[in-house]
Amino acid sequence: MVSIRLPDGSVRQYEHPVTVAEVAASIGPGLAKAALGGKLDGELVDTSTVIDRDAALAIITDKDADGLDIIRHSTAHLLAYAVKELYPDAQVTIGPVIDNGFYYDFSYNRPFTPEDLEKIEKRMQEIAKKDEPVTRRVVSRDEAAGYFRSIGEKYKAEIIESIPQTDEIKLYSHGGFTDLCRGPHVPSTGKLKVFKLMKVAGAYWRGDSKNEQLQRIYGTAWTKKEDQDQYLHMLEEAEKRDHRKLGKQLDLFHMQEESPGMVFWHPKGWALWQQVEQYMRRRVNDAGYLEIKTPMIMDRSLWEASGHWQNYRENMFTTESEKRDYAIKPMNCPGHVQVFKHGLRSYRDLPLRYAEFGSCHRNEASGALHGLMRVRGFVQDDAHIFCTEEQFIAESIAFNTLAMSVYKDFGFEHIDIKLSLRPEQRAGTDETWDRAEQGLRDALTACGLSWEELPGEGAFYGPKIEYHIKDALGRSWQCGTLQLDMVLPERLGAEYVAEDNSRRRPVMLHRAIVGSMERFLGILIEHHAGAMPAWLAPFQAVVLNIAESQVEYAHSLTQTLQKQGVRVAGDLRNEKISYKIREHTLEKVPYLLVVGDKERDAQTVAVRARGGVDLGVMPIEAFVERLQEDLRSFK
C-alpha cells in the first residue's frame, strides 16, 4: 500500500507502486492531460517516475513556475534535436534554463546565421507537433560515456566524467535524439507549443576562455502566446531604453577599448551622477553615518589577513612597488575596519556607522562586461555599521526604513526582499546563526516588510538581506544588501571595551542601498527611459530665444535662474526655434523656456513641459515656483 499526500492535505492510497502520471489520472482526466511533472517530497520529477513509498506529491502543470521551467528545459532539448537533424556534424554540449528562456551551446564548423535560426525554429515546431513521447532511462557511467563516444559527442562524454560517482546518469530520448540530463522533462513534445529562437552568441566550453569557443543559441518559451508576445514587446521596449544607446543619445558617457569596463563620464552624465551621490550623502548624513575615505591601494598583508588574497585573488588587480605586493581594493570593508581599529573603542561609542563612496576595481572577464551594468571600475555607496549584538536589530530596522525610502524617491515602488540563510559550510555556532537569522527576520517584520527565505544561500560568515528593485519593464535588479559578518572583525582584530571592561568583537553589518553607482545609474536611465525627473535631470530647463533680438533677455534669464539654483542652460544659437525645440526634446529636458519679443517685453517666459505639454506664458517667478513644487513632490 502506497499513501500519497496531496497539497490540499488529502491522502490517496494505492495497492501498488504508481507513477506520477497515474496519480494525476486518478484525480481527474483534466489533470492527467495537464501534468508536466511532479514535486515528490520537494523534488521535481518526471510524470513517469514510479512512487513505491509513502510520499507527499504535487502535480506540476503549466500554471506552476516549476512547470514553466520544465517547458523551457525541454524546449532546450528540442532545440538540440532540431540542430542535430539539420546539421548532423554539430556537437551538443549543455542547455540549461535561464531567466525567461533557455540556451544551448553547440560546436559547429561555421557560424549559425539568422537564416539558420529560422530553419531550426521551423524544425522544432514540426517535431513538437509530432507529440513524440519523451522517455527516461538510468544507465551506468560506462554505458553512457560509451554511447556518446560512439556517436562522436565528445563534450557529452567529458561531462559524464565530471559527474560525481554517487549521481545517477539519466538519458532522455524523444524520436531519434538522446541527451544526457538530470531532468525532469515534459512527457511528450506536444506540450511545447510557444517558443522562439532569439539570437546566437559566442561562449567558451565550461566558461573558460582557454577552451574552445562554442555557439550559444538563445531561446524563449512560454505556456501562452499572449505571455510570449508580452515578453517580446518588453524586449523591444528594453532595446529603446538601453542605457548604452541613451547614454550616447543624451551625451552622458562613453566607454572605449583602451579602458575596458571603465566609464568616461561626460558633463551631463557627471551632473546626473552628482545628483545621485549628493542625495545619498544627505540621506546617510541625516541617518547618523560618518563619511570616511580609505586608500584605493593597500598592501598584500592586509588582504591576506582579511582572506581576500586567498579567496578572491583572481578578481583583484595587483601591482608591485619596492618589492612589496599591493592590491587595488575590490571592496571597502577591510579599510573600514582599519578606521574602526585606530584608537580604543568603548561600548559607549557604538553604534559607529562609517560611510564611503568607495572606488573599487574588480578584474571581471572581458566577455562579462556590459555597459554600466557590469564594469571593472565602480563606486559603491558603501557603509559598515559596528555595533553590539544587542544593537544590531535596531540598526537593521533603521537601515530597512532608510533603503525603502531611498528606492521610493528614485521612483521604484516594488521591492522584493530575500533573506539568505546559513549554508552547510559556515563559521560560528548554530546558536549564533539562530540569533542572527531571527534578528534579521524581526527587523523586517518590524518594518512591515514581507520577504522570501533562501536556505543555504547565505555567505559562510553570516546571513544577509537582499533588496531587488523592479523597474518600469518589470525587470528585477538586486541593488541593496544588508550582510551580517561574524568573521571579518575577528580576522582583522576589531574589538571594543565592553561595560564590564572585557574586550569584545563588534557585530559588523555591511550595507549598501544602490550598490554600484554605475550600475544604479544604468538602471535609472532605463527605468525612466532617459527622461529623468526634474530633481535628477542634468539640466532642468533650457532657455531658447526665437530671434537675435531676444538674445540679451534670454542670457539674462539664464543667469537669473542659475543664481536661484536651477540647473539651466541657454541655447542662443541662430537656428530656427522648431529645430532647437526638437533637439532639446530629444535630449529629454524637463522644461523648455521659449522667449520671443512679447515675452521679452513683458519679462515673462513661454513654458513647454517634457512631452510637448504647453503650460503657457508665465512670469519667471511662477516658473521657479512650479519647478520647486516638482522638486518637493519627489519627497
Curated annotation (Swiss-Prot):
GO terms for molecular function: ATP binding; metal ion binding; threonine-tRNA ligase activity; tRNA binding. Gene3D superfamilies: 3.10.20.30, 3.30.54.20, Anticodon-binding domain (3.40.50.800), Bira Bifunctional Protein, Domain 2 (3.30.930.10), Threonyl-trna Synthetase, Chain A, domain 2 (3.30.980.10). Keywords: Aminoacyl-tRNA synthetase, ATP-binding, Cytoplasm, Ligase, Metal-binding, Nucleotide-binding, Protein biosynthesis, RNA-binding, tRNA-binding, Zinc. Its main location: cytoplasm. Disulfide bonds: none annotated. Belongs to the class-II aminoacyl-tRNA synthetase family. This is Threonine--tRNA ligase. It comes from Burkholderia ambifaria (strain ATCC BAA-244 / DSM 16087 / CCUG 44356 / LMG 19182 / AMMD) (Burkholderia cepacia (strain AMMD)).
